[in-house]
């Protein structure tokens, strides 16, 4: 199972819910999730925000599915 699908299910979201949260058509989202279509940088960003994770998690650069903490200046 892809990280994207795994995390979506962990959050209890359907593909229709992801469409509502990201604005990505459900058909396109399904293709992205199943590896039949690549996502754009902007789509990846929207998905990461919707699933409360980092884009690095989807890229396999980290195994931590939580977003990075923001640094206060």
Give residue spans per PLM region.
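The alpha-helix within a helix-turn-helix
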Residues: 8, 19, 48
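Helix-turn-helix DNA-binding elements, focusing on the entry/boundary residues of the two helices
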Residues: 4, 15, 26, 41-44
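A short, Lys/Arg-rich alpha-helix, primarily the initiator
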Residues: 1-10
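Short alpha-helical DNA-recognition segment
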Residues: 12-34
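DNA major-groove recognition helix of helix-turn-helix/homeodomain DNA-binding modules
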Residues: 23, 42-57
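Short, charged recognition helix plus adjacent turn
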Residues: 10, 49, 59-73
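DNA major-groove recognition helix of helix-turn-helix
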Residues: 33, 43, 59-62
């Amino acid at each position: 199972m892809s990280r994207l699908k795994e995390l979506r299910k962990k959050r209890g979201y359907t593909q229709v819910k992801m469409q509502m949260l990201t604005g990505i058509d459900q058909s396109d989202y399904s293709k992205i999730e199943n590896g039949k279509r690549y996502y754009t940088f902007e789509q990846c960003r929207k998905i990461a925000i919707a699933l409360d994770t980092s884009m690095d998690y989807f890229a396999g650069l980290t195994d931590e599915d939580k977003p990075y903490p923001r640094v206060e200046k």
